[in-house]
Amino acid sequence: MEYLVTMTTHVPDGTSAEAVQDIRGREAARSRDLAAQGHLLRLWRPPLQPAEWRTLGLFAADYDAQLEKILASMPLRVWRTDQVTPLAPHPNDPDLETREPGSPAAAAWRSEFLTTFTVTVPDGTPAGEVANTEAREADRARELAAHGHLLRLWRMPGAGRTLGLWHADNAAGLQAILASLPLRAWMSVQTTPLTTHPSDPAPASS
């Protein structure tokens, strides 16, 4: 099972710079260990306010209690609060192994983004129209994955909610991509631009 974890760190007042550097170094080493074990999949930095220390992580664990043990093993946990969102498989989640080397999906991109979709079908919409729109959405997802824009999709807790991981040149490029989705007229979208985290286990070419 996969999880999105929002990790917010609050360094206690009076903590020395040396202590902060020490725990950050141990955190980086532990992150490498967890990545090697297949538990830590990705790390990103979301937009931050001045003096804010927050990280988004994609983790894998067999069950909730195992994830808690994983998070508790990270040195920064003593200063950190974690918000965990369990993620379920999505039928349109791209199969990363089908991408060919040298394709746009394997090239370096400028930016990554997370999106949260909430789909609300208007009352009275015929079932046939819903089925047709969902089928076209699946086709479009495959096209965007083949072009390297759509990386992952997961179901989130709550009706009609989906988490997506995307590649685009910039925010305007992402908005153009999202506008091409057949379900766009029925969905609200929350977008989070991501920047590189130094301990992200993903290769630079992902």
Region locations from a protein language model:
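Conserved, structured core segments of small domains
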Residues: 1-206
